[in-house]
């Protein structure tokens, strides 16, 4: 559950595509809807299952099984490109090698 506009909203991990940082807030992008939540990306990412999500940029966490294409420094999710940050490339590369 996440707190959105004074309500506790249930979001299934399998519905999450990407989580983006918005300073003291995050935007949780799901298949059907986006949610703005008052928390930090680091804090929220730490609460997620590590086998399902990976930090790919200082402002982005992605659902591993939702990544469709990897093109150099971008991961494409739902046909949209998300930049893979330099300090996250090595762990991302290891994940891709181990995922296959």
Per-region residue spans from a language model:
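Eukaryotic intrinsically disordered, low-complexity regulatory linkers and tails enriched in Ser/Thr/Pro
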Residues: 1-5, 88, 93-100
């Amino acid at each position: 559950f996440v707190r959105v506009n004074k309500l506790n909203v249930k979001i299934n991990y399998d519905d999450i595509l990407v989580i983006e940082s918005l300073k003291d807030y995050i935007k949780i992008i799901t298949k059907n809807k986006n949610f703005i939540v008052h928390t930090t990306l680091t804090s929220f990412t730490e609460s997620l299952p590590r086998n399902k999500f990976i930090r790919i940029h200082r402002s982005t966490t992605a659902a591993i099984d939702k990544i469709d294409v990897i093109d150099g420094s971008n991961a494409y999710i739902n046909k949209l490109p998300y930049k893979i940050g330099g300090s996250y490339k090595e762990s991302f590369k290891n994940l891709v090698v181990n995922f296959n």
